[in-house]
């Protein structure tokens, strides 16, 4: 067997890489926000990025392996899933060990919730209960939001309470995004645009989340606790939620179109957050 054929047999995209492409933004948004907030990118920051991405990628082959063992996937997927699982684990552990050697051992505390959610996710897969678990997805985005304080602390070289503020701010946005995404997917099942009262009723949770976020951040910015311009990215998400809930429901829209729109809004949020946090 040639090297090319070995690579082609091992690199099976749906096993090696996550297929829910929208999840990438929930990883890189907090990571980039934390890195830019620290305003100091070091070799330790690069190692942290490698460790975080490895941990994120680990979920896909682990999920495939559980599905293969439970009969939901072909048993032929199991060896490939094992290969990627051990590769990501090796890279992640080496990166984590390097961070500990450099004096960032306290980051291990941030990994504890991630380990718990990871095994809970695998349990749900084994029970065939992983689909449409909005609560679990909100908790999972909270775990990914821990990348913000991790990147911030590594950039500073030490823990700082402001890292927890970044974590909370990022998680608020991620949770609202998850709720809104579920609403847009629910719109797809409608045969006609709903009336205004109906649209408000089925979308009130998403409206509540984004309104709460906007009011909270605006109030904290007004008191000087947060940068004055930081409400802008939250206003963006709030306006998008109002528009998509009340005026342009995703009736009959393709999931890909919904995902792309969510990706664009989340990307704009991240860019605006970085700019307003650092320039205010």
Annotate each PLM feature.
Residues 1-50, 57:
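N-terminal signal-anchor module of multipass membrane proteins
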Residues 11-25, 73-81, 122-142, 191-206, ...:
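Interhelical loop and helix-boundary elements at the membrane-water interface
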Residues 25-31, 88-95, 140-148, 204-220, ...:
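Core segments of transmembrane alpha-helices
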Residues 32-48, 96-110, 146-167, 217-230, ...:
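Helix-coil boundary and interhelical linker segments in multi-pass alpha-helical membrane proteins
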Residues 43, 47, 83-120, 210-249:
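Transmembrane helix-loop-helix
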Residues 135-190:
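Hydrophobic, aromatic-enriched interface-forming segments
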